[in-house]
């Protein structure tokens, strides 16, 4: 059986990792051993942060809704409760967008929530 030298395979593997580490600082983009660790860690961060992104955006939406609700004399939780009781089906992403860009429409929603809470 012929001897298999793995130089070509190793070179390809190293090239692939170094390509993924392109743009990293210092040895992280030049030295295979360090680049490999950096790429693995980057993958772990990416995996973790894809999940965290969902939480962070929801927290941002809630903060924006809360700010808008307080300008209209409600707290966030009372606003959401009032909208649910008024059977207004609108998600937090859209509600936050309305709070940011259309104060008049948000005030109308707040009044609707207040009405449902009073009833």
UniProtKB/Swiss-Prot annotation:
Matching Gene3D superfamilies: 6.10.160.10, Ribosomal protein L20 (1.10.1900.20)
Q: Does the keyword Protein biosynthesis apply?
A: no
Which UniProt keywords are present, listed alphabetically?
Ribonucleoprotein, Ribosomal protein, RNA-binding, rRNA-binding
Q: In its UniProt record, which GO terms are filed under biological process?
A: ribosomal large subunit assembly; translation
The GO terms this record gives for MF are: rRNA binding; structural constituent of ribosome
UniProt keyword Ribonucleoprotein, yes or no: yes
A Gene Ontology cellular-component term? ribosome
Q: What does this protein do?
A: Binds directly to 23S ribosomal RNA and is necessary for the in vitro assembly process of the 50S ribosomal subunit. It is not involved in the protein synthesizing functions of that subunit.
* HAMAP family cross-referenced by the UniProt entry: Ribosomal_bL20 (MF_00382)
Q: Which family does it belong to?
A: Belongs to the bacterial ribosomal protein bL20 family.
Give the protein name, as stated in the record. Large ribosomal subunit protein bL20
Gene name in the database record = rplT
